[in-house]
């Protein structure tokens, strides 16, 4: 499977996935028509499908135009069907489906929105998490609760370390600075921060990243880490309380 990643709008990631065997191409979300069409033209691909992660405007703005141009089939969460509009196929939580010759799972990951989906290709170890899991970060809880987002992160943390993560926004540099405020003695985090700053200095993208790297450095995936809990002075609190505190601190960062 081939992947084309590019920037849309200001900091949205545009992502195209292409199955070489079938010739099928899909977009993960539809943040900007011009950027997506340019990427398709650059690769000489034709868009057949759009997988929507959630209903926020910066992820669905180009749906109508892309449907008109390519007659693409739009697939997304049943729970947000009315808010998204343009859906041709509505998915139930954790439903499995095919893209070309590949199987994918529409993992239910509520928190950022109540119907948020993360698309996981188990055979290829690819995860497209939308605005749920960011590199070194976590989506804001616009609709869900800390408990819901924690359960979503527990689900994602179970995926293999070699899984490649693609997410919805280039927020990694800011997330890295926040992570250091909580986990300053984490040498793996310091190395990751250095790498991120070097990439951004060249205006290069910081994704994809392996889930293993995220498990070792992303504070939102480390709610049960003893050192992090000690740094938060929350050694005896519940996982939910720790996760909620990290999210609260990020909101105020």
From Swiss-Prot:
GO terms for molecular function: hydroxyacylglutathione hydrolase activity; metal ion binding. Zn(2+) 1 binds at residues 54, 56, 112, 131. Monomer. Its EC number is 3.1.2.6. GO terms for biological process: methylglyoxal catabolic process to D-lactate via S-lactoyl-glutathione. Its cofactor is Zn(2+). It comes from Bartonella quintana (strain Toulouse). Thiolesterase that catalyzes the hydrolysis of S-D-lactoyl-glutathione to form glutathione and D-lactic acid. This is Hydroxyacylglutathione hydrolase. It catalyses: an S-(2-hydroxyacyl)glutathione + H2O = a 2-hydroxy carboxylate + glutathione + H(+). Keywords: Hydrolase, Metal-binding, Zinc. Belongs to the metallo-beta-lactamase superfamily. Glyoxalase II family. Binds 2 Zn(2+) ions per subunit. Signal peptide: none annotated. HAMAP family: Glyoxalase_2 (MF_01374). The keyword Metal-binding applies. Zn(2+) 2 binds at residues 58-59, 131, 169. The keyword Nucleotide-binding does not apply. Pathway: Secondary metabolite metabolism; methylglyoxal degradation; (R)-lactate from methylglyoxal: step 2/2.
